[in-house]
Structure formats: C-alpha cells, structure tokens
Amino acid sequence: MAPKPEVRRSPVAALLYGAPIGLLGGLIGLGGAEFRLPVLAGVFEYAARRAVALNLAISLVTVVSALLIRGGTLSFAPLLGLVPVIASMIAGAVSAAYVGTALVHRVSERLLERVILVFLVVIGSALIVEAFLPQDVPGLLPDALPVRVVAAVFFGLGIGLVSSLLGVAGGELIIPTLVFAFGVGIKTAGTASLLISLPTVAVGVLRHRKLGSFADRADLTRTVAPMGAGSVIGAVAGGFLVGVVAASVLKFVLGVILIVSAVRIFYR
C-alpha cells in the first residue's frame, strides 16, 4: 500500500514522533537516532536508503543543538587531556563515514535492510548489557599515549561505519567506548561524543547530498525539520527528567523495544 503523505509524512506527525524519541534518548544520554530509524522506515514508509540519509540529517540537527546547549551549561576544560584521543577518533570516524555513505548507495535495498537489522540488534543488545554494568569503571586501555591514539583511530573507524550505515550520530557507541576503554567520566564522555559526532555526521550528510539523497526538498521540510525539532525538545526535557526513572531500567526496556522493532520492520 502506498504511503499517505498527508498523514504519515506530515510535519505534525514527524514532530510528535520526534519528541518522545528525543525524550527517551535524553533520559539515557543519547540522541535517539537508533529509535528514529525504525519509525522512518516503518511508520513513514521510507525505503531503507532514504531513511538512513534522513536520519543522518536529523542527527546533525540534534548534535548541533546539543553542543550549543552544553556549551552554555558545561565547561569544555575536562576535555583538554582527551584531545589526542578525540582527534584520533574523529580521524577514523570521518574516514569511515565517507566510505560508508558511498556503500549505502551501492548496495541493494535488501542487503542494506539486513545490515541495518544486524546493527540495530547489536545496539539493542548492548543497551541491555550496559543496563547491568557499573557506570564508574577504570579504563581498559593502558595510559601509554601511542596505544590510546591507535586504539582511538580503530574505534573511530567502526563508529564512523555504523554512523553512516544507520544514519546515527554514534553516541550509543562513542560514550561506552570512552567510558570503558579510556576511563572517561560519563558527563565528559557525553560532551566528547558530541564533538566526535559533529564532523562525522556532517561528512555523511554532505556525501548524501552530493549523491542526491536530499533531492526531494519536501522530505527536509515535512520530516527532517519537524522531527529534528521534536527530537531536540524531547532531549532537553529528558535531560531535566534524568533520575526520575533509573537509567538501567530504561536501557533494558529500550534495548528490548529496539530489537523487536528492528526485527518487525527490517526482517523480510
């Protein structure tokens, strides 16, 4: 059945879906892009390739907004000691995002759906596992700078690939990596994640634009702009409500929801 543009892809619907997704993401410190993708493909009935591109564009809106908000409330001073790690992770992530975006346009829709399914199930499983892990843990990597730099590049490559193939900012991978591998505090990791995500997502969006993903301007006005606005509003509200519900419980529940949604929508 053909989608009903006036209902399924209306700006109001995009806003109303974006807000609760942003709210739930904000409660666990994420932007919610991994939860938007099933909505774009399942509810708004975009093909997988188009859904990934639009999700990435919305992710750019949320990352820029989050950086502006954090810049006015938090200090960037704690990041100074992480500059080599952040720069190395950006180098790897941007390189992989450039290549990954091209792959999105080269593989078949069916193969892309299978790849999306696998990644979403992995991310959902990671959320479930993370719900049972302590937040304050020593970094697994040694303090030797060369080791940390090389590791950051390789981590960045994986993060950039996932970002480009799912259209996500990558916070769901960057933050746990910084916390568990590099021993970074959760708040500092959240800010560093945004700095790493911004160039990664920007490169992906520019590549998608060059490859014609945003040729239909109606997608930008009816879906990207309102869903981006809703996601930002929801994320801000979620930030204020942190602690109302235990993050571990939310991660477990959202992990299960993500896996079920991914299987229902992308398993054909």
Question: Which residue ranges define each predicted feature?
Answer:
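N-terminal transmembrane alpha-helices
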Residues: 18, 22-30, 56-59, 63, ...
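Alpha-helical transmembrane segments of polytopic integral membrane proteins
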Residues: 37, 61, 100, 125, ...
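Juxtamembrane transmembrane-helix boundary motif
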Residues: 1-22, 42-43, 48-50, 69-165, ...
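Non-catalytic alpha-helical scaffold/packing segments enriched in small hydrophobic residues
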Residues: 39, 152, 161, 173-177, ...
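Transmembrane helix-bundle signature of multi-pass membrane transporters/permeases
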Residues: 52-63, 190-201
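Aromatic-anchored, glycine/proline-accented short structural segments
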Residues: 174-195
